[in-house]
Amino acid sequence: MRYIRQLCCVSLLCLSGSAVAANVRLQVEGLSGQLEKNVRAQLSTIESDEVTPDRRFRARVDDAIREGLKALGYYQPTIEFDLRPPPKKGRQVLIAKVTPGVPVLIGGTDVVLRGGARTDKDYLKLLDTRPAIGTVLNQGDYENFKKSLTSIALRKGYFDSEFTKAQLGIALGLHKAFWDIDYNSGERYRFGHVTFEGSQIRDEYLQNLVPFKEGDEYESKDLAELNRRLSATGWFNSVVVAPQFDKARETKVLPLTGVVSPRTENTIETGVGYSTDVGPRVKATWKKPWMNSYGHSLTTSTSISAPEQTLDFSYKMPLLKNPLEQYYLVQGGFKRTDLNDTESDSTTLVASRYWDLSSGWQRAINLRWSLDHFTQGEITNTTMLFYPGVMISRTRSRGGLMPTWGDSQRYSIDYSNTAWGSDVDFSVFQAQNVWIRTLYDRHRFVTRGTLGWIETGDFDKVPPDLRFFAGGDRSIRGYKYKSIAPKYANGDLKGASKLITGSLEYQYNVTGKWWGAVFVDSGEAVSDIRRSDFKTGTGVGVRWESPVGPIKLDFAVPVADKDEHGLQFYIGLGPEL
């Protein structure tokens, strides 16, 4: 019976404490700015139901406030507590009145650098970031300075670095603080030989992917770049390049071992999609990321939709000198088109030499052969072409599948002449640009521009794939896909020799991954620039940032067009650049 009475007493005490806690609110007065923010951070671990007016809780709050102020140089605050009665409706308020007191000021920042750090520009630059004498102490500055010393060591290869001394001295009587740091970076390590394990690709190709030479000073960014370059080849399923520290302590020359595992020899991808331009589409792709020890690769794909059916291949041959940025590419395929007033069967074969520059630009020279049998409107022709061309392009982006910043630029020139067997003389210039910029996180702007020009004396022999048509999702919305072009006398589309289109789109982040869009597109496809016929479309849309890329739905109408006035809608999935 006595035990039961004791248990009941304990229970009543617990319930009483909980009731008090639930009826008391903590409030801090006397602080502002960074001091208030720091103290709030220290107090954030206290739950609202833990607040009580007792001495133990007040001591806990007192300690938290002092820690928050101490970090910013206030070591001798005055803290008084006052328990106020509740307002008409509410809880009692425990007030902590804080007077920060006199701050501790920086009295000296003594930092001694030894080893390679004495002459290293990054370490010397770091010395200039020390707080000035007389400024209020911030312990975070001191800790961040030490972290920066260590960070430079890891980044630049001072792997034997150590702090001989690291003290933050406080003289409370003087209200002064003194840094006292003695740091020895030791000798900087250098890159040694890179050994690869598990690779199916010849070693000389892998060695030419290494972005540094033996004996170069260590830089962590160079090691990261080697990992990136190996992964970018597409040859490997996994890549890990790691330094061998146990072999470098005496010589300070750091050998590296790259452990790789080959990617699966064959991969097959299938997909079903829909776009307003071509309707439902089925696509299948077969990839061989490596075919031999020279790193050759093959991609074959087929795509089937109602107006277009394609079958193509791409065979890539990296060059030993620079396997990632320089390569030959042989491409070929067959395409059948039945769209609007175009019916064509086209067979192509292209040999290209590519250079990917460190600036991000990609250059290529092409030699193209094609055989086209086509009916464009009222004209039927068979044309064989053999012509060279040059191309330069660059794509940059930041922010994932729906970039917050980016641009894509592509320029090409092709030239055909009957002197080497082509059926028609022509020169073609094309330019495409897309720019994406985001302001204040929620405001996104997308602009597009396209320019095309064909110069020829026999336009009827130019295949439809080289002629210009406007209209559609990536051209002028409000019009059907490839529906804008000069026409024959019977009203059938002929195609144009000149093209210019532009688009301005504004997107607003409504919530989460959802964006609203408004846009205006304009341009023309003509054969005589003296007979300008600009078309303009405008509309609204929705964007969803899905895990596989942006999905969009647009509604657009032509502007001031007496012949076209219906509503067009566009559904699409895929990158904007």
From Swiss-Prot:
Residues 277-278, 307-308, 337-346, 371-386, 416-427, 454-499, 524-535, 558-567 are extracellular. Residues 244-577 are annotated as: Sufficient for outer membrane targeting. One of its GO terms (cellular component) is TAM protein secretion complex. GO terms for biological process: protein localization to outer membrane; protein secretion. Keywords: Cell outer membrane, Membrane, Protein transport, Signal, Translocation, Transmembrane, Transmembrane beta strand, Transport. Residues 107-170 are annotated as: POTRA2. Residues 22-264, 289-296, 318-326, 357-360, 396-405, 438-443, 509-513, 546-548 are periplasmic. It is found in: Cell outer membrane. Residues 22-106 are annotated as: POTRA1, required for interaction with TamB. The chain crosses the membrane at residues 265-276, 279-288, 297-306, 309-317, 327-336, 347-356, 361-370, 387-395, 406-415, 428-437, 444-453, 500-508, 514-523, 536-545, 549-557, 568-577. TAM-mediated outer membrane protein folding is significantly inhibited by darobactin, which acts as a competitive inhibitor of beta signal binding. Residues 1-21 form the signal peptide. Gene3D superfamilies: membrane protein fhac (3.10.20.310), membrane protein fhac: a member of the omp85/tpsb transporter family (2.40.160.50). It holds the Pfam family POTRA_TamA_1. Disruption phenotype: Not essential, cells grow more slowly than wild-type. No changes in permeability or outer membrane integrity. Loss of cell aggregation when adhesins are over-expressed in a double tamA-tamB deletion mutant. The keyword Ribonucleoprotein does not apply. It comes from the Bacteria. Residues 171-250 are annotated as: POTRA3. Residues 187-263 form the POTRA domain. Contains 3 N-terminal periplasmic polypeptide transport-associated (POTRA) domains and a C-terminal 16-stranded beta-barrel transmembrane region. The 3 POTRA domains seem to form a rigid body (unlike BamA where the 5 POTRA domains are able to move independently). Upon substrate binding (Ag43, AC P39180) the 3 POTRA domains move away from the inner surface of the outer membrane by about 30 Angstroms, which would deform either the outer membrane or TamB and may provide force to reset TAM. POTRA1 is required for interaction with TamB. Component of the translocation and assembly module (TAM), which facilitates the insertion and assembly of specific beta-barrel proteins into the outer membrane. Promotes the assembly and secretion across the outer membrane of a subset of autotransporters, such as Ag43. Involved in the assembly of the outer membrane usher protein FimD. In vitro, when TAM is reconstituted into preformed liposomes, it can promote the assembly of several outer membrane proteins, including OmpA, EspP, Ag43 and FadL. PANTHER family: SORTING AND ASSEMBLY MACHINERY SAMM50 PROTEIN FAMILY MEMBER (PTHR12815), TRANSLOCATION AND ASSEMBLY MODULE SUBUNIT TAMA (PTHR12815:SF47). Belongs to the TamA family. Interacts with TamB to form the translocation and assembly module (TAM). This is Translocation and assembly module subunit TamA. It comes from Escherichia coli (strain K12). The gene is tamA.
